[in-house]
Amino acid sequence: MTITAGMKCPSYGGEAVEAWGQQTMTVQGYVAGATPFFIPSNSVVNVTRSPNLITTIMVLDGITNNGNGTLTQRVWSSDGWGKDKTFPGTVWQILPAGQSGNRGLLIEDSTDFIAITDVSRVASCVFSGTVNVNGTYALPAKGLVFARWNDSAATLECDGNNIYSRQDYTGYDDIARSVNVDIAIFAVQAPVPGRGLNFINAAGQCTFSTTRRPFIFRNQFFSPGNSWVDIGNSMIALGSYGFNSSVASGWCNMRSKGLVMSGNSVKGGNGRVRSRWTDRYSVTGERYTGMSIPIIPAMY
């Protein structure tokens, strides 16, 4: 176990359920000064609205932090429809650094674990290891999934229950790709005290224990796009981050966007085929979700 600067506490802020007519999400249990973020489990849909023959593609365009414990989803549509929509996913917040009264063990730029009053939303690392993803991998626990892999042709996505691997491709076929992936899953389970270092709050609840690996966060984020970005020896949060729609074999094939990693570099990539329709009414193009994805050191 390594004790280092940047030990933060991720806190579960609730689940966004897919819905129409609304775009604002509440960060449940919001703490002032925390860093909220959203991990979408799906970021694209297509809707055919009668009498239109050409489908409307809608994509999660970004997230606005309103600064008051709420987040607003921004939605883009291929024909300017402008319908409000909530895309599904999970809301999280990274509790701020602090040190109450300068007492106890000071770990630089770290959450004051003793000041956490309620552990019901605290997430800790419940699984870490290397797994093989060959098309679909069922997660051993549901939570916030960070990953690292080395394959410049493998796009990874996650819907909260499964990791999906696809060849980064724009043709007709939906091609699975086998890739070994290092993952770390943070789920809402309070730490269990044991041998080693434990932090106990005033209510007698364990808020940190070296029986589980800590969440190390150094304020690093990645915004998905087509260009490779060096993120160092790090892991990145998996989700769904946009769409690509292209014509092949007489069909318009709409894919969701995921992430591709090669060495220390990461970029966006084309993932699963989510829908297809005749190219007589094609809608082509691509768009990434303009959002910041958290990055953590690859120490798990």
Please give the residue ranges for each predicted region.
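Extracellular receptor-binding modules and their adjoining Ser/Thr/Gly/Asp/Asn-rich linkers
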Residues: 1-37, 41-44, 66-136, 167-251, ...
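Carbohydrate-recognition beta-sandwich/jelly-roll modules
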Residues: 153, 257-258, 287
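N-terminal accessory interaction module
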Residues: 62-69, 251-262, 266
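A cross-kingdom feature marking solvent-exposed beta-strand/loop segments within repeated
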Residues: 52-62, 132, 151-177
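Generic marker of "main functional regions" within proteins
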Residues: 147-149, 155, 191, 195
